[in-house]
Amino acid sequence: MFRTSSASAAGSGGSRWRGPVAVAAALLGLVTAVASAQLSGPARSAAPRRTLTVATWNMCGVEQWNCRSTGSPTAKRNALEAMASRSGARVFFLQEVCAGDLDRVRADLGASWHTEFRPYTWRGVTGRTTTVRCAGAGQGAAGVALLSAYRLSAVEPVESRQPAVGLRRGILCATVADQGVRVCTAHLSRPGDDRAHPDWELRDDQLKALAAAVPGRTVYGGDLNTDPPGPRDPDSWIWPAGPYRAQRECDQASASSRSGRPTHVSGHKIDYLFSDLPRLDCSVRGTGASDHYALLLRVRTR
């Protein structure tokens, strides 16, 4: 039985979620204690490998992207490791993660953990593409990643429409071999991200590419940079048919529900986990080390 509390609307409109650093930091401190509460009580016991807990978290690890006041690299790594050791997360979808932090976390968790990484790139007006780097010695490139306690196979990026000029994020998929579950982490563009065509909407094409990339037995999601679809949201048209219908969202209370708890300090829900597998638990966790909360979904795999 899926356990959840009453979901509330996460807000709508065209607000930009990465606001001034001071505002984000203040909100982060105010709401962390509230958001860190689990959605439900202790999970029922289950046979090993019959369930899978997947977490998505935008770590806000790229300091130059208004992230300097959201927590140190050490705090971010500790929060990630705690979700693995205390919350039972076995697959992570990560956004705005630094390659150096990812390598350190994998080493701390042990040799049985596996990672896959796709860097962000910047495409200039001349067409030259460069890799986005994290600030700080040894932090390496910034990007999206999969972190898994199980071996990952059939790893591949998903091609999707990206800005002609500007920041290119992306979608990365793999199969959790021991579970036979296809997983995809995504970080979508924001309106105006294409410097050459600031009025172009890219998220509709990116969402279609993401939804088309997943077969049955899947968990997918990440930072989608949009509110849930709804009558008061002018951007609802960007959502394809699969999400919320063929695959239920972590915090989706019913077939007709399109709301969920906020996953960002601005009060918006912009982080998602969708699955066609039976959902058992959904929780939103304030880590104190990002302007995003972590979203955790436990599904039955057998």
Positions of predicted regions on the chain:
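Active-site beta-strand/loop signature of hydrolases that rely on acidic residues for catalysis
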Residues: 53-59, 82-105, 147, 174, ...
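Short, flexible/disordered intra-domain loops and linkers
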Residues: 64-72, 126-133, 194-198, 229-237
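Structured beta-strand-rich core segments of catalytic domains in phosphoester-bond hydrolases
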Residues: 97-180, 285-286
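Alpha-helical scaffold elements lining the catalytic groove of polysaccharide deacetylases
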Residues: 70-74, 198-212
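Metal-dependent phosphoester-hydrolase catalytic domains
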Residues: 3-4, 11-14, 38-39, 212-219, ...
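Active-site-proximal beta-strand elements of phosphoester/diester hydrolases
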Residues: 51-66, 156-158, 180-190
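N-terminal, active-site-proximal structural segment of metallo-dependent hydrolase catalytic domains
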Residues: 2-109, 122-126, 302
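Metal-dependent phosphoester/phosphodiester hydrolase catalytic core
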Residues: 170, 174-201
